[in-house]
Every structure is written in structure tokens, then in C-alpha cells.
């Protein structure tokens, strides 16, 4: 344990604060959270939209069973890949995990890379109700039959504001916006105006964004993807593909899954699949930098090797 981490053990619990550790994929978030949880008597609460799925432990870099045995972990691998797990569902689960942590006197440490989840924690989330399965199935069928252009045209007729805001080629977001307006009679924009209150107001949290040097991060991403393949990621994807799930489900679009499925079908080589998976992950990391910079400026950016020291300074 570093001196700074040792100091955090004294500083943070006295204040009863929650700690938020965000950052791009492969930036060292989990290691920092584990050290902090061990030092402070904390519980690590997953704040990553892909690590909720039980089918993809290796490919989503979930904590190992050994790490999970060291400190309490919550919301990891609890959702089946067949479920379209929404941000609203995550907030509900996170609220229960937060209440449990506080009831047991544990420091809540939210860790992950999903910006929308962190925004919901500190800013609140729109109160869009659950969409009836029949509506969702109807929209998906129209998407498959007519394509995204026809679906976007339908959205433009029902909800021109959302249609103008969305990329017309973004199948998932266009379908989601049309589902909402057809199921509720209100546009997604209207629902976003009626946000639910935040679970953790900004003044109650210590929030860091781990920001490695880009070239170092991209090298880590490439190396880690190869290690994932060696650790059984391809077997995970084969088992997932055998279930023949809707390709639009979030788990089916996890970084690396589509390319590895193409490899399993004999369409591309293993090396080509790995190259695509690495490139997709690097692009995602770049988007994470941009998203947090513009959407959550209250997060303090820090180099990973200075994060423990910075946490101590913020809370001490």
C-alpha cells in the first residue's frame, strides 16, 4: 500500500463520502479501486455497462474471482446477455447497492467507464418508463424489414427534434427514440427534461477521471486484447454466439464480440478479428475522453500513477 493510499484510509471514511473512479478502458481503474477498498473498508460498485453481463467476464475485463474475494464487489456479472439492461435499471440496482454499503458502514466506490451511469449518479436520469416488449419487437421488426433509413423517417414524423439530433445511421438510438415516442406518446427529449434526482449530488462525492497518455493507453489496449484471447475470450464469444441472440442487444455489441463472431464463422482470420477489436476499443477510449471532458467537467483528471495521491489530497 502506498503512503497516499494509507492516508486515504484515515481521511475518506470519516467524511462518509462516495468515491467515483472513471476513465477510459484499460486505464487502471480497477486496481486503484481495489487498493482503496482494502485500505478504507470499501465496496466496489460496477459502473460499466458491459461488465454487468455474466456472459463476458474475460472480454469485458471484469475483476477476477481472486480480486472479488478480497473486497465486496457489486453489480458485476449479474445480468444475462439476453437482457437489454437500461441505464434506468442500473440506477435502480446502484441505489440498492449504495444503501447496502452505507447500512454496513462501507465506503461506496463506483468504478467504470460508462459516462451515462456516472451522469445519472450525480445529475439524475430521465424518467422514461419501461417499454412494452410488444412495442420493442414491432420497432425491431420494422428496422430489419425497412432498414434504418425508413425507421429514421418514421421517427422524423413522430419526433422531429430527436430525429434531427440523432445520427440517421445509428440503428440502436433511432430505434430507441421511436420506441419511446410510440410507447408513451412523448418524445425522448421531453422525457429527458423530467430527470429523476441524482443518487449522489456532486458535493457528496470525490470524483476522478484517470487520464493516461494516449500512446501508452492504446498500447495497453492492444496488449490486453491479446491477453483476453489467450485467457478464453474466444470461447466466451462462441458460447454467446451459440445462443443466437438479437445482434442489437448491448452484450452482442461489446467491443470484440462482432469481430470474433465473424472469425468463428470463417469470414476473417483471428489476427484480423483481434485488429478490429483493438481498433474499436481504441476508438471507444477516445470517445470516453471527449464525453467526460464535455459532459462531466466536475471530474478531476489525473494521471493514473498520481491518482492515489490526489484522492488523499481531495479527502484529507
From Swiss-Prot:
Where does this protein hold ATP?
Answer: 23-30
Bridged cysteine pairs (disulfide): none
Needed co-factor(s): Mg(2+)
Q: Where is this site: Interaction with substrate tRNA?
A: 114, 136
Carries keyword Magnesium?
yes
Which Gene3D superfamilies has this protein been placed in? Answer: 1.10.20.140, P-loop containing nucleotide triphosphate hydrolases
**Keyword annotations:** ATP-binding, Magnesium, Nucleotide-binding, Transferase, tRNA processing
Q: EC?
A: 2.5.1.75
Database matches in InterPro entries: Dimethylallyltransferase, IPT, P-loop_NTPase
UniProt binding sites for substrate? 25-30
Cite the GO molecular-function annotations of the record: ATP binding; tRNA dimethylallyltransferase activity
Query: What's the catalysed reaction?
Result: adenosine(37) in tRNA + dimethylallyl diphosphate = N(6)-dimethylallyladenosine(37) in tRNA + diphosphate
Region: Interaction with substrate tRNA; residue ranges are 48-51
Give the highest taxon in the source lineage.
Answer: Bacteria
Share an example GO biological-process annotation for this protein. Answer: tRNA modification
Report the protein's function. Answer: Catalyzes the transfer of a dimethylallyl group onto the adenine at position 37 in tRNAs that read codons beginning with uridine, leading to the formation of N6-(dimethylallyl)adenosine (i(6)A).
Complex formation: Monomer.
Question: Which family does the similarity line name?
Answer: Belongs to the IPP transferase family.
Q: Which PANTHER family match?
A: TRNA DIMETHYLALLYLTRANSFERASE
Indicate what this protein is called per its UniProt record.
tRNA dimethylallyltransferase
Its source organism is Rhodopseudomonas palustris (strain BisB18)
Q: What is the lineage of its organism?
A: Bacteria, Pseudomonadati, Pseudomonadota, Alphaproteobacteria, Hyphomicrobiales
Name of encoding gene: miaA
